[in-house]
Amino acid sequence: SVAYTDSIPLVAALLKPVANLVGGTFQYMGWFTLVCFALQGGFGALLAGLFLPGCAAPLAADLLFVTSPVLFERVFRHTSLGAQFFVLAALYFYFAARRKGQYASRGLFALNVLAVGIHPYFLPMTYAITLALLLEYALHNRQLAGPGLYLAANFGGTALLGWALGLLYGSASSGGQALYGYFCMNLNALWNPVGVNGVLYSRVLPAQNQVYGNYDAFAYPGLGVLIALPIAVVLLRRQLGGMLRRHWALACCCAVLTVFAISNVITANGATLATLPLPASLIKLFSIFRSSGRLFWPIYYLLMLLTLVGLARLKGRWLLAGAALLAVVQVWDVSPGMVQRSAAMLQAMQTDAFPTEMESDFWQAAQQYTAVVSMDEIQDDALHLALFAADNGMTTNDPFAARYDETALAAQRETLLAELAAGTVREDTLYLFAEEGAFLQAVEPVKDNAWCGRVTSTDGTCSWYVIAPGLQGQ
């Protein structure tokens, strides 16, 4: 399913008719990124407006959200996760509902349903915020039925869209060797300004060491936030206790998300402080969200929001001046990373991002097939194989997916290998092998019915053993 390819499945499904209409590939990633920036700014301003008076101060403070290093780090390299506005919107609907004394937020319902169609990693975040709202309402008003039915409706809507997009087919049991704990959040994440490929989001703070997959838990909030946050805590020192009591469920959910983000593999700078033993069953369960560091994002934005709540202690011109100063320091600090990401994007636009290695006479002839199948392993060059299949309208069992059904894949390969052992080839199928031994074992019964041999990429970095029915003698 496209749902496992980080291709923003809901948008892909809605725009497929457009691709058919224009007679080819319709590139929607840029449009989606534009929408992400617009909605990040919109919901950021709405959220800031709940705590800051007037228009000027919330708009100035909104720069914290629209220049969020996490936003820029994601939209330019992992577009589906650029929908950071889901977290801001969930927080806005939470606080708006709390102020109205409501629990049945239409906005949260929409977010919980739509999140599964954008990226499943947003689900635990939006649902955690929803659960906090429901728990606080239920215990304060001693009503369980209404919040329970509302939560059930949310689950139902999420499951329905997930089913429609193919997320509920199979088990999606495999996604590589890395399990829960590998992509954990380093304890230095809040003051480590280095992103992927060494992109530095600070003019002041140096890059800190990381281990394992800490890079995926990038959570630098910016120097403006880091300076303003302790000031806000001091200004709010008498109100913090009351805030935590009023929003106790949100605080508990944030604590759970933070612990999950840090994981059982506790890292600090370049060291692993401890690896807490967990049952294999829990590791397998938690590996559904193996990139655990991402689940810190609600806390990340709440820390930004806390600086604005502290800022609200200022009055009149001091408030606007404080908001403007905070925004200026923030943008000044994080702008190098923004410039680097922009430059990398411009450079990528000047060259073919994924130059094909499949330009030989063999690959020209192979365009006649309707299916290309990987027979023994997920291929090292899975991306180019997936693009080759897509460009030529082929099906493939090696689609460069984030997750795949390991059991179904093994069953399909067993069926295909049994057919080859019986001397039967599918004339519309190109068979690929990564291992020479597996290829030699499978090829003997069908060597007279297909071209069989080794094909190397144009640059010599990749090679495949192939069984190509109908190409013998060519």
Where are these regions (language model features)?
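Membrane-interface coil-to-helix junctions
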Residues: S1-Q40, S68-P69, H78, P193-N197
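Signature aromatic-anchored transmembrane alpha helix within multi-pass, membrane-resident enzymes
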Residues: A152-G156, C254-A255, L305, L311-V339
